[in-house]
């Protein structure tokens, strides 16, 4: 019995212990279950102890994920649609700066509070490959109709959205972003950021290490996400302000950029919690453009860097290199080769100044020449004179021969094919004598300049080819002849470091596939800022990007450049007097006054020669001298004559006796339908007035055909007019060529609109060719008013109708007349009815478009056009 009682008590004790254990287990499990739930929704205090080196413990799902598959990006044009708050907004300008630096096409719209979206689709093709909102709230709060249209477009064409959240209040904000399953906190200060290495977004950016320190600004927005459809890209810790919301964990990591993977609604989005002032945000922005465009808007990861050291042997005492500086240059070159493949400093010398420093500096000169094979070399000018100051080629040749003789005496290679002019003088604006002398003495194939098309902004710098010399853009790096001491750097040493570490110099490398950097001898003596700059730049680029840095010899580099940018081969000449820097490095013997104030652009066979005769009758209007090679017309803007340069062009014009009252002009009737002429003309003479004459395009086509017959064109003699204009695509090439010259210039609206892309409407005068033929005095009064030329010339008294010739002529003294030559006003059989009917139908749509354009411009319809439009009804 006692045994049974003992067993019973033991059993009770065991049950109580088990029950107690179960209760404790339940309590512990409940505690950890609750803690786990809380950790998923609020970033716990433990997160503050986590560093970027231990990313797997961060409170986000950081496993590698796959975003929505992008659609075929070829279904859209490679153009970015950018919605900005205003055309002057700071963030909007930063966005445009990156797009322009990357040479991506874009279209700007002011983000509408209400109203219609721009047209998104044209002929079943999407107009935009990517949409960027400077203020993402304008996208989120869009009215439902336009939002559904935009989202439908994005889904159908696989178009992504990039947006920036801008806080409007000064206090810390916390709210749910409309339509998105996560919370955001605004107006925060953050620090210590790192990159999610699993983000599918990053390409240029390397997830390497923690970026310690405070991030710029106190207006940051951070995202608290807990959904597999959203992936953080960058994290940062929230700093602890006094008014920090209780829901924000102190020192916790939050996302400052998130990637909506498109799993929810089929649209991928990248949302930024701040502007682009922070360099890492700017880098991710570049990657986001590449990713969301299906890599159609992307640059290669290869970066070619050439570091020029100008002014070798030049410089006053105390600023030059000594032996230790030269040894440091060699050591650093070897060091840089570990990070920049084939890195070699490129030394530009002026032999006249050899051994003109202190004794130690002269020894430095000798040390350089003793290591001549370790570097690349290029000629500066012998005496460091600016080439534009030499007015004849022979003087330039003499200077170059002296420098070449020095090179040969000291074993400096003379076959690199590269040269740089002091202060970039003579390269652009072009000093032809420099190009010719370079070819004769050095056989130069490449040079570089920071002046084309202008020094600033640097992102607009381009290359071109002239006289078979390839001209590449040159970049500055913040080092000039006077920047030789670290502590005395303009703005303080931090300014140089900021440029290197995510600033201007860093992004020069990121955004330019090829960079030729200008430095100077003085940057490698004293504090050796040149070495400091490029060692630290290479380290920073390697640490934070996946870019592949390398160096090529100059000629190879130039060929690589024009492989990447073949559209830059043709130069675009500008007026040197419109840029003070250009004017300063342009010969004082030249003048911009010899550029025309207006152009008569054609088209051919509309009466342009008659207009020319009437214009030169005016005492204040002067024309170009005739060209013996192109039927008296200069034909500069539309032909290869353009590559002869502006000196060649201006030589056709006289120097005006009075710049204010004299009007220079030229007539080249082929300009009208030229693809290149409008852009070229607008670049060189942007304020020039443009005059065109329009007659019935059917009559113009027939007149051109007869003109070609009179010049014994084989196709015109062989085929009838109707056979020419109605020829099919399989017709002989010579017949198709004649057909094109007959018909295409008559597409009046298309050609005028091309000119209006580059010239404002008030600079364009459209003359009714039929009225010019019947009432030239009235037309010439209109022309004088349009040009603003004085004194007013009375054409009613100066013109007389020649009934024998059939057109108006200039009335001279004693009743004599001056008329157009025998080739003008030629009579020929009337056009056959079949051809007239064919052309009336062919030009119908073109004439309708012309009427719409003239109505839009507020210009009257010519009488012939009104007659043609009546046939349309």
Swiss-Prot record:
Expressed in which tissues: Expressed in brain, kidney, liver, fetal and adult lung, adult pancreas, placenta, fetal spleen and fetal thymus. Not detected in adult/ fetal heart and skeletal muscle.
Biological processes, Gene Ontology terms: heparan sulfate proteoglycan biosynthetic process; heparin proteoglycan biosynthetic process
Organism: Homo sapiens (Human)
Highest taxon, organism lineage: Eukaryota
Name of the protein in question: Bifunctional heparan sulfate N-deacetylase/N-sulfotransferase 3
Active-site residues from the entry: 605 (for sulfotransferase activity)
Keyword check for Membrane: yes
UniProt-listed Gene3D superfamilies: P-loop containing nucleotide triphosphate hydrolases (3.40.50.300)
Location(s), subcellular: Golgi apparatus membrane
One cellular component term from this protein's GO annotations in UniProt: Golgi apparatus
Lumenal side: 35-873
Function: Essential bifunctional enzyme that catalyzes both the N-deacetylation and the N-sulfation of glucosamine (GlcNAc) of the glycosaminoglycan in heparan sulfate. Modifies the GlcNAc-GlcA disaccharide repeating sugar backbone to make N-sulfated heparosan, a prerequisite substrate for later modifications in heparin biosynthesis. Has high deacetylase activity but low sulfotransferase activity.
EC nos: 3.-.-.-, 2.8.2.8
Pathway: Glycan metabolism; heparan sulfate biosynthesis; Glycan metabolism; heparin biosynthesis
Family: Belongs to the sulfotransferase 1 family. NDST subfamily.
Disulphide bridges: 809-819
Catalysed reaction equations from the record: alpha-D-glucosaminyl-[heparan sulfate](n) + 3'-phosphoadenylyl sulfate = N-sulfo-alpha-D-glucosaminyl-[heparan sulfate](n) + adenosine 3',5'-bisphosphate + 2 H(+)
């Amino acid at each position: 019995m006692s045994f049974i009682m003992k067993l019973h008590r033991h059993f009770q004790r065991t049950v109580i212990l088990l029950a107690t254990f179960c209760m404790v287990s339940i309590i512990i499990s409940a505690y950890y279950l609750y803690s786990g739930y809380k950790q998923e929704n609020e970033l716990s205090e433990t997160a503050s102890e986590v560093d970027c080196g231990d990313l797997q413990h961060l409170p986000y799902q950081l496993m590698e994920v796959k975003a929505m598959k992008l659609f075929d990006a070829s279904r859209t044009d490679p153009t970015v649609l950018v919605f900005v708050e205003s055309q002057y907004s700071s963030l909007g300008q930063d966005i445009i700066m990156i797009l322009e630096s990357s040479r991506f096409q874009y279209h700007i719209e002011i983000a509408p509070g209400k109203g219609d979206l721009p047209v998104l689709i044209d002929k079943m093709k999407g107009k935009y490959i990517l949409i960027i909102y400077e203020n993402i709230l304008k996208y989120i709060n869009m009215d439902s109709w336009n939002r559904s249209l935009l989202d439908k477009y994005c889904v159908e064409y696989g178009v992504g959205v990039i947006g920036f959240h801008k806080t409007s209040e000064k206090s810390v904000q916390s709210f749910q972003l409309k339509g998105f399953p996560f919370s955001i906190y605004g107006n925060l200060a953050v620090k210590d950021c790192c990159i999610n290495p699993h983000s599918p977004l990053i390409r240029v950016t390397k997830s390497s290490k923690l970026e310690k320190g405070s991030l710029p600004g106190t207006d940051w927005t951070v995202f608290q996400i807990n959904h597999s459809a959203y992936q953080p890209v960058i994290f940062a810790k929230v700093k602890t302000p006094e008014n920090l919301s209780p829901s924000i964990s102190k020192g916790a990591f939050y996302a400052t950029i998130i990637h909506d993977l498109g799993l929810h609604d089929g649209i991928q989005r990248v949302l930024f919690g701040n502007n682009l002032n922070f360099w890492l945000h700017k880098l991710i922005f570049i990657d986001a453009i590449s990713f969301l465009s299906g890599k159609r808007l992307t640059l290669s990861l290869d970066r070619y860097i050439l570091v020029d050291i100008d002014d070798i042997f030049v410089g006053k005492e105390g600023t030059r290199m000594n032996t230790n500086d030269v040894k440091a240059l060699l050591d650093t070159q070897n060091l840089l080769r570990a990070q920049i493949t084939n890195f070699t400093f490129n030394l530009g010398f002026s032999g006249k100044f050899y051994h003109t420093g202190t004794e130690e500096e002269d020894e430095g000169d000798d040390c350089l020449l003793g290591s001549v094979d370790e570097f690349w070399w290029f000629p500066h000018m012998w005496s460091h004179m600016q080439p534009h100051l030499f007015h004849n080629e022979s003087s330039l040749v003499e200077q170059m021969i002296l420098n070449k003789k020095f090179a040969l005496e000291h074993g400096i290679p003379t076959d690199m094919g590269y040269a740089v002019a002091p202060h970039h003088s003579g390269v652009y604006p072009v000093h032809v004598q420099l190009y010719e002398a370079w070819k004769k003495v050095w056989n130069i194939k490449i040079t570089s300049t920071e002046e084309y098309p202008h020094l600033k902004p640097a992102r607009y710098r381009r290359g071109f080819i002239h006289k078979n010399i390839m001209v590449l853009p040159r970049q500055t790096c913040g080092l000039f002849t006077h920047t030789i001491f670290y502590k005395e750097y303009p703005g303080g040493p931090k300014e140089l470091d900021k440029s290197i570490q995510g600033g201007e110099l860093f992004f020069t490398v990121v955004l330019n596939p090829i960079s030729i950097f200008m430095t100077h001898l003085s940057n490698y003596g004293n504090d050796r800022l040149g070495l400091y700059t490029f060692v630290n730049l290479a380290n920073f680029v390697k640490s934070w990007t996946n870019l592949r840095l390398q160096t090529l010899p100059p000629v190879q580099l130039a060929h690589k450049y024009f492989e990447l940018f073949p559209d830059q081969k043709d130069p675009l000449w500008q007026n040197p007097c419109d840029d003070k820097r250009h004017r300063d490095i342009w010969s004082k013997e030249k003048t911009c006054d010899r550029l025309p104030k207006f152009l008569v652009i054609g088209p051919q066979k509309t009466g342009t020669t008659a207009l020319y005769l009437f214009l030169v009758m005016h005492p204040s209007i002067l024309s170009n001298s005739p060209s013996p090679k192109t039927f008296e017309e200069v034909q500069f803007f539309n032909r290869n004559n353009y590559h002869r340069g502006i000196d060649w062009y201006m030589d056709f014009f006289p120097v005006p006796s009075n710049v204010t009252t004299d009007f220079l002009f030229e007539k080249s009737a082929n300009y009208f339908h030229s693809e290149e002429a409008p852009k070229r003309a607008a670049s060189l003479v942007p304020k020039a007035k443009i005059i065109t004459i329009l007659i019935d395009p059917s009559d113009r086509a027939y007149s051109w055909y007869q003109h070609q017959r009179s010049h014994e064109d084989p196709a015109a003699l062989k085929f009838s007019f109707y056979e020419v204009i109605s020829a099919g695509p399989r017709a002989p090439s010579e017949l198709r060529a004649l057909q094109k010259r007959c018909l295409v210039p008559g597409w009046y609206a298309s050609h005028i609109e091309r000119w209006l892309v580059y010239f404002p409407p008030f600079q364009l005068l459209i003359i009714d060719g039929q009225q010019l033929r019947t009432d030239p005095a009235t037309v010439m009064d209109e022309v004088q008013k349009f040009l603003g030329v004085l004194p007013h010339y009375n054409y009613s008294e100066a013109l007389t109708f020649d009934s024998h010739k059939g057109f108006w002529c200039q009335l001279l003294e004693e009743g004599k007349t001056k008329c157009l030559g025998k080739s003008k006003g030629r009579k020929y059989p009337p056009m056959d009815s079949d051809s007239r009917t064919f052309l009336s139908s062919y030009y119908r749509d073109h004439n309708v478009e012309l009427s719409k354009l003239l109505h839009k411009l507020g210009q009257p319809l010519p009488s012939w056009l009104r007659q043609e439009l009546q046939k349309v009804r």
